[in-house]
Amino acid sequence: MLKEFKEQRLNEIQELRSMGIEPYPYKFEKELTAREIREKYDYLQAGEVLESEKLSFAGRVMSIRHHGKTAFFHMKDDTGRIQAYVRADSVGKEKMDLFKRHVKIGDFIGVRGFPFKSKTGELTIYVQEYTLLSKALRPLPEKWHGIKDKEIIYRQRYLELIVSDEAIERFRKRFKAVQVIREFLNSRGFIEVETPILHYVTGGAEARPFVTHLNVFDIDMYLRIAPELYLKRLIIGGFEKIYEIGKNFRNEGISYKHSPEFTSIEIYQAYADYNDMMDLTEELIVEVVKRTCGTLKISYQGKEIDFTPPWKRVRMRDFLKEKLGVDILEDPDEVLLKKLEEYGVELEIKNRAHLIDKLRDLVEEELVNPTFIIDHPVVISPLAKRHREDPRLTERFELIIFGREIANAFSELNDPVDQYQRFLEQAKMREEGDEEAHMMDLDFVRALEYGMPPTGGLGIGLDRLFMFITDSPTIRDVIPFPIVKPKKFEEEEAEFEGGFEE
């Protein structure tokens, strides 16, 4: 059982220290990764030995096969696995006995030696010396039932990363995508900036916020639901091409495509409009997909998504009229509500903005390939500039992929009088019970009164984008440490005990 296993490992540690061996030394000079070793020496033929080439490697022991005075074992680092071979006449009898007694699956060790290929053709390190680097006190999941419970994976992601090369590659792809985004924008003259996480008032999106309390001023504050209004303040202050990658927080439900804590990027460009931001969105995502997946046609959950540009652009009014037979500009609320009732949609709040939002949700599911839905009504776009050809609409787009909103962008509203009136309308909606409506932000209106140039703004939900490039069915699969319902530590330990096998 787990308790006995840990006691045995603790006894081994005590024994090592009594021998003058520190089981947790400070460093090891690792020269090559597993991938670099494979790339450098894969040309060797089966049975070929390259004793003149010395190398050092370190990683976690994933398996061991003892054969008398020799042992084969696999080690893993963050680039993959490599086999190693140790024998008594190479490291000495004392060190071989120490290896057999004290090097276990899950431990970290460093090895020095030379490469060769086994008779079966597997690239292997011939160990001439080794150093124990870290003793593991717990068995790896491969020693019990594996990881079948997704909740355990989400609570203890490190376990999945230890035993699953696929998980390592999934998150490597996520982290690489972030690098690609930064390289793409930096090469175009954008500057990465930072704005506050703690807000005095919420803004930039329609969502229920997390509330916290700042003791030093004895005031309530909010975790940001979006960085938009602070980024626009930077544009007002004189920056022209900026972006921010960071966490946002919305105190709402959890689903396969929603997380209360999520990562987004927001991008703002002075003297640009929503057409420019559409082009930028398309070019940016194409670059990310191409460099992380190697192709623009990817498989997602058994279906093909084609990211090849140019992407389709559809006006929201035309799209809903074609699919549902309603006119979101001309039809009264009663007609829109009746259409929703036909589809069995129930609404707690029945203002026009919510009616249009729910109608949109009904039809976006069928959009698989990237599609821009453009020109939203003013009532659902309080921060977007009115359309230059129809003041009932705004210059706004949403990017839909596989039925999910991935990006949202505007020609930004820079008329302070119009913005103030929109805030008043949002405040009225809050008074009527809409907790997701925007709060009045008088300081932002004041900032606009100093003048903001014509500006294009864009926000992309990165977690959802990363779901596509990693073929992950749920958003929690691409968030390293997602929010899950907590369990007591003792309960989690009992679950482990239940699956443990000696």
From Swiss-Prot:
A GO molecular-function annotation: tRNA binding
Cofactor note (record): Binds 3 Mg(2+) ions per subunit.
Sequence positions that bind Mg(2+) 2: E405
Binding site for Mg(2+) 1: E398, E405
Primary location recorded for the protein, binned into one broad class: cytoplasm
Catalytic reaction annotation: tRNA(Lys) + L-lysine + ATP = L-lysyl-tRNA(Lys) + AMP + diphosphate
InterPro entries (alphabetical): Aa-tRNA-synt_II, aa-tRNA-synth_II, aa-tRNA-synth_II/BPL/LPL, Lys-tRNA-ligase_II, Lys-tRNA-ligase_II_bac/euk, Lys-tRNA-ligase_II_N, Lys-tRNA-synth_II_C, NA-bd_OB-fold
Location relative to the cell: Cytoplasm
Gene3D superfamilies on file: Bira Bifunctional Protein, Domain 2, Nucleic acid-binding proteins
Cofactor list: Mg(2+)
Signal sequence coordinates: none
EC class of the enzyme, as a word: ligase
EC number annotated for this UniProt entry: 6.1.1.6
Keyword field contains Lipid biosynthesis: no
Transmembrane segments: none
A Gene Ontology cellular-component term: cytosol
PANTHER family in UniProt: LYSINE--TRNA LIGASE, CHLOROPLASTIC_MITOCHONDRIAL (PTHR42918:SF15), LYSYL-TRNA SYNTHETASE (PTHR42918)
Subunit structure comment from the entry: Homodimer.
Identification of the protein by name: Lysine--tRNA ligase
Native species: Thermotoga sp. (strain RQ2)
